[in-house]
Amino acid sequence: MLSFFYILGQVSLPFVRVPIGGSNIDSRVSVFWIQDTRTGKSVAFEIVQRVCRDIGIEAVDYSTGTDAALVGSFVQENSDEPPVQRPGVLAGRKCMNFDEGSILLKPNQHSEGTVLFLQTALNAAGTGRNVLTKHLRDGTINIKSEVSLWITTFPPKGIREHVLDKGIFQRVLPIGS
């Protein structure tokens, strides 16, 4: 059932906005699934990927990477021409799987940057607050992100502190065993 609403949120995203006060929320559903290892968490996203492929929605896996992988970078394709912007995996409308979401819970410099990008990516579509900006030597990258996240992990130590302190949990639907 969760998979259905996850996919439906992406399908209806261009058409649905729910007014709340002076703003709105969109139809995306993002999931943070915490369950013991080797219990089949990844299998659910495999089914989601197949359905998404069949209906024309991109579904990608992500385990780790750089800011450039998430937001994008400038690439020099020809030395005679200026660098060209290459968007990162958070650009556009898609379903995105973090198979080991524990990387988002480890307090290190890299994961903190990743969490900030994901928080921005999950801001309500249509408000302009879901645009990620990265200032680089060759210019500034601005991408609009309309991803739905499917994050899975085992129950890490200190999960209560993360739930209470990290903004990523305010933007996803937590599922636990």
Regions picked out by a protein language model, each given a short descriptive name:
Residues 1-177:
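Phosphate-handling catalytic cores of nucleic-acid transaction enzymes
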